[in-house]
Every structure is written in structure tokens, then in C-alpha cells.
Amino acid sequence: MNSIPSFNSYIERSIIKNWHLDALTDYKGATLQYHDVARKIEKLHILFENSDVKKGDKIAVCGRNSSQWAVAFLAIITYGAIVVPIQNEFKPEQIHNIVNHSESKLLFVGDVVATEITPDEMPTLEGIIYLPDNSLVISRSEKLTYAREHLNAMFGHKYPKYFRPEHVKYHVDDPEELAMINYTSGTTGFSKGVMLPYRALWGNLDY
């Protein structure tokens, strides 16, 4: 593994190498192969790019463990944005506080969280995306709305003759570059964000 230069390079090579193998399975649900994961990641990258999401912007994810949660996480990391995972069990006010404190631009939510949070409590968010199907719960950005409505057409225009392994090209990360802000459970007050660089994620894989 030490011959692979970065975390995202490892993800990229794993997807290409295992293109037709099973990657993610939901309990009593569907199985995604690596090429399915790659396709979903690429669609989210197109959505981010056309919504003016820049590398280094923060994107939060809050939902139960699922293949769609994993896809969103990987899409954020491999785009070069900073992922802010939020525990699904947190109360709405904790979620609001973390989104605001982290200055997240977008928020992915699962089915339960979507019904509990109050978008008006997170005024700087540009959009909330529903994890099960990547539909928009709310959009405050015309570019985000347009990109989501035309996402399939944008994908087809970019890849008119199928999406293939050679199209998988991810953000080249630096070991010291910020990858994730992980918030604690906040047992002594408000949750505190721990800033994790890419080398921390790579260290977990290498271990």
C-alpha cells in the first residue's frame, strides 16, 4: 500500500481494479458493484461542480449507515471538499449547531433526519440533499436546483459512450490537507470539531 501516493489514489485504484465486483450492500437491500459506486460518485461530482462547490468547501452528511451514505462520503472526499460526518443520533439542535459551526455549504440527510431538522436554523446552507435518492429537500441556489434537475443530461453529455474505468480521476490530496472535521458527542457541552488531514485517513487504511 505504501506504493500508492495518497488516500484518494487508493480509492481510485481500488474502484478501477475491482470494477465488476461487489462493493456495498444494504441490509435486505440492493448491492452496488464498484462501477455503480463510481458512477454515483461521478454524478455527485458533476452536481458539486455545477453548483459552485469548490475544493475545500465543507459538506455535511447525517444519516444511518447505508450504501448511499458511503457514496456521499466518498464523493465528497474524492472531489476535494471537506466532509463533516454528523452522528445520526444527534438531536436536531446539535445538527443545526454543527452545520453552522462548520460552515457547511451542503448537507446530505437520511430519511429520519430529514423529518426532524429545521432548515431555517441553518441559514448559510445552500442546499439539503436527501441521501436515499439525492433529491433536493431544499435549495437556496439556482445553480444547485438547475444542476439537480439536469443531472442525468449533464452526465450523458459528459460521457456519451458509457462511463468507463479510465474516466475515474479523483482529487490528488496532500497528506497535510484537511479531509474531514469530526465532531464529538458533546457530553461536556457543544460538540467540538476535530480536524483530520488526509494522512489520518491514510494511516487507518495502512494500519
Predicted regions and their residues:
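Conserved pre-ATP/AMP-binding loop-to-beta segment of ANL
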Residues: W19-H20, R148-Y183, F190
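Conserved S/T- and glycine-rich ATP-binding loop of Class I adenylate-forming
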Residues: I59, I76, L107, L178, ...
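Structural core segment of the AMP-binding/adenylate-forming
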Residues: Y10, N50-S51, T78-G156
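Surface-exposed loop/turn positions
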Residues: D57, A81, E176-E177
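Conserved AMP-binding/adenylate-forming core of the ANL superfamily
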Residues: S3, H20-D52, D57-L74, K91-H96, ...
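Conserved AMP-binding A3 loop
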Residues: Q33-H35, Y170-H171, A179-G203
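Short hydrophobic alpha-helical segments of the AMP-binding
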Residues: W69-I77, V83, L201
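Short amphipathic alpha-helical/adjacent loop interface patches that line ligand
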Residues: I41, H45, Y198, L205
